[in-house]
Design a protein with these regions (language model features):
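Terminal, regulation- and interaction-focused segments at domain boundaries
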Residues: 1-27, 31
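Ser/Thr-rich, low-complexity intrinsically disordered terminal regions
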Residues: 20-63, 70
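Short hydrophobic/aromatic-rich motifs at helix boundaries and adjacent loops
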Residues: 5-6, 34-36, 75-76
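Beta-strand/loop substructures that line and gate deep hydrophobic ligand-binding cavities in soluble
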Residues: 56-91
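Conserved active-site and cofactor/substrate-binding residues in soluble primary-metabolism enzymes
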Residues: 10, 14, 59, 94, ...
Length: 107
């Protein structure tokens, strides 16, 4: 598992668009599901992506959650999982870290 948390001072829609564009540039990436909420002056978006990891030889998922209250900053949390191999220990997590790096490069 790898995790990225950021606080961004820009528009919610701009951040969401950059996330979606960055992830979907991968040939094997798919948007598995999504959910969007609005309540009073808050917004939340959840995206679950999956892609094939050539390094790990398996599929890796990434959950991205964006949250904004009013005109405050956009909070982003991205967590990848599923890229390790082995039954009892987490080894070979390159795929998880590489998937997360697709966001690091655009945020």
């Amino acid at each position: 598992m790898a995790k990225l948390e950021k606080t961004l001072n820009e528009s919610f829609d701009s951040v969401l668009r950059r996330v979606e564009e960055a992830v979907m540039q991968s040939v094997s990436a798919t948007l598995e599901d999504s959910c969007d909420w609005r309540a009073e002056n808050s917004r939340c978006a959840v995206r679950v992506y999956e892609r094939y990891s050539y390094m790990g030889g398996n599929r890796v998922s990434m959950n991205v959650t964006l949250f904004q209250s009013g005109n405050g900053p956009v909070r982003l949390c991205a967590i990848t999982s599923g890229g390790s191999q082995a039954m009892f220990f987490k080894i070979n997590t390159w795929g998880e870290e590489s998937f997360l790096d697709t966001l690091n490069s655009v945020l």
